[in-house]
């Protein structure tokens, strides 16, 4: 795996999400990066998954990071 830089992590949140997951009345955006044990990163309110952009280069070295945008934040949307 190529090492993820902070700039790469920032670009990750400018691009469309890897997948949209239906949850209740919403579609939750999920981005996945890294390799290793699965790690779920859930942001607080009123921010988005992009809040982890500086942390991702470090975590992605040893974990598969699944970063979600909660409904109403980032690329997620209510349906």
Where are these regions (language model features)?
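Conserved HGGG/HGGXW glycine-rich cap/lid loop of the alpha/beta-hydrolase fold
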Residues: 26-78
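An N-terminal hydrophobic leader/cap segment in hydrolases
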Residues: 1-20
């Amino acid at each position: 795996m190529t090492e993820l830089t902070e700039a790469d992590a920032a670009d990750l949140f400018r691009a469309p999400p890897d997948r949209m997951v239906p949850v209740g009345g919403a579609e939750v955006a999920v981005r996945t990066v890294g390799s290793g044990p699965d790690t779920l990163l859930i942001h607080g309110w009123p921010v988005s998954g992009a809040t982890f952009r500086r942390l991702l280069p470090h975590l992605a070295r040893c974990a598969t990071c699944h970063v979600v945008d909660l409904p109403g934040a980032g690329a997620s949307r209510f349906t």
